[in-house]
């Protein structure tokens, strides 16, 4: 992620977003943490912290809870050294009977000009349970959403964005 440095163009901002998506989909906290400055400031929902060790600790706990995690990030907006993304991911919640859930949210990122690493990350998101009682199976006639990221679905498939729009707007 650090190889792409600000100031961003539409193309480089898009590359940064997809690189981050791919890194997060590895679910490797140590590898993911390399994209952030040593003193990076994070807000993730109601958690506020700073620094590489805290990032690794947070991500380790996150992915211990969020099993079968699959994430999609899309470029929302950008300026010189800032990028905003919308994202959604699905996972099975190991703290809630392995129910399938989908998280929807927005992030804003600020990058260091010299290193290209993220120096601030703020995330706000909400979760919904998928299927009846979290089984992940859609029941359209009842308005119950199911999983989008079935095992053979590419997270970058354009139909996922269409599903988001159709389901909620």
For the regions a protein language model found, what residue spans apply to each?
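A beta-strand edge to alpha-helix "cap/lid" segment located at domain peripheries
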Residues: 3-8, 57-169
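Short helix-capping and hinge/turn segments at secondary-structure transitions, especially at repeat
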Residues: 25, 37, 41, 60-68
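Short solvent-exposed beta->alpha transition segments
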Residues: 41-62
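Short, low-complexity N-terminal intrinsically disordered segments enriched in polar/charged residues
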Residues: 1-38, 163-169
């Amino acid at each position: 992620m650090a190889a792409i440095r600000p100031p961003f163009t539409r193309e480089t901002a898009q590359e940064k977003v997809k690189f981050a998506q791919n890194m997060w989909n590895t679910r490797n906290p140590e590898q993911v943490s390399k994209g952030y400055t040593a003193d990076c400031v994070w807000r993730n929902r109601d958690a506020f912290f700073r620094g590489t060790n805290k990032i690794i600790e947070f991500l380790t706990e996150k992915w211990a809870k969020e099993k079968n995690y699959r994430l999609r990030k899309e470029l929302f907006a950008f300026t010189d050294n800032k990028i905003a993304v919308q994202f959604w991911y699905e996972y099975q919640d190991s703290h809630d009977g392995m129910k399938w859930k989908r998280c929807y949210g927005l992030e804003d990122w600020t990058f260091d000009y010299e290193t290209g690493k993220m120096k601030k990350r703020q995330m706000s998101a909400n979760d919904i349970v998928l299927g009846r009682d979290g089984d992940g199976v859609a029941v359209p006639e009842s308005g119950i959403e199911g999983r989008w990221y079935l095992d053979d679905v590419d997270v970058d498939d354009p139909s996922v964005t269409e599903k988001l729009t159709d389901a909620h707007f």
